[in-house]
Amino acid sequence: MCDKSKTVLDYTIEFLDKYIPEWFETGNKCPLFIFFSGPQGSGKSFTSIQIYNHLMEKYGGEKSIGYASIDDFYLTHEDQLKLNEQFKNNKLLQGRGLPGTHDMKLLQEVLNTIFNNNEHPDQDTVVLPKYDKSQFKGEGDRCPTGQKIKLPVDIFILEGWFLGFNPILQGIENNDLLTGDMVDVNAKLFFYSDLLWRNPEIKSLGIVFTTDNINNVYGWRLQQEHELISKVGKGMTDEQVHAFVDRYMPSYKLYLNDFVRSESLGSIATLTLGIDSNRNVYSTKTRCIE
């Protein structure tokens, strides 16, 4: 039974407070990854930041903890314009958002630094990029400076809406939804899955947010954009937000249900939380793999 008095944050803290100490007890020196995945506006960014603060308060005196969103690795605005031209007939890759619109070289460089942090004693920090979604009238651009994190990194939190989505093997897996513009997106998704959640070198805990109606994303994303505009004075119009979310729906329809059923985001354990339109928890599942 789901305890309706508990919030998403309550369940997430309980989960991590169980598995993180167990991880440290193993004496493993490689970084522990914490993957957050959930639809846009579901609260994964808010929750992951709260978890970062919780872990900093609990372990920050003795452990190095990093936090990033997959959004922070978006292509620069200039490079996104080049991608727009390269895939000018693919509506899903026109603008940031989907697999294929991130700087994979930068992501790999950051991951390599985190993984090899014991091999370079002369390097004491890793720089995590930051992305400003309000630039260029909501099209966004990378910030000129990033965030420095002390090496070696003990815990690295990464959140993103498609983390854990597994690409379809064309010719082997039959899926009527894998057509048109989604063929390119699916092909690019392999790079992410191989580098992150399917990477056998990464030891991870997964937290998954799912919902009873994927159309909740429209309302959530509008709420987010209104909050952004109130803070910085610029952002997307409601019509732009709706069109923006439309580009994500083919991916949700193709990957989301299988991903949620698999409960496999974390290589060690995965917590899956079902939330309604008000972000109240209506179901919980925990799967321990290791």
From Swiss-Prot:
Keyword Nucleotide-binding on entry: yes
GO CC annotation: cytoplasm; nucleus
Enzyme class: transferase
Positions of ATP binding: 38-45
Phenotype of null mutants: Leads to cell death when overexpressing the camptothecin mimetic TOP1-T(722)A mutant.
Cellular compartments annotated: Cytoplasm; Nucleus
Entry EC number(s): 2.7.-.-
Top-rank taxon, per record: Eukaryota
Keywords assigned: ATP-binding, Cytoplasm, Kinase, Nucleotide-binding, Nucleus, Transferase
GO molecular function: ATP binding; kinase activity
Job description of the protein: ATP-dependent kinase whose specificity is not yet known.
Miscellaneous note of the record: Present with 4280 molecules/cell in log phase SD medium.
Family: Belongs to the GLYK kinase family.
Record-given protein name: Probable ATP-dependent kinase TDA10
Organism: Saccharomyces cerevisiae (strain ATCC 204508 / S288c)
Record lineage: Eukaryota, Fungi, Dikarya, Ascomycota, Saccharomycotina
The gene coding this protein: TDA10
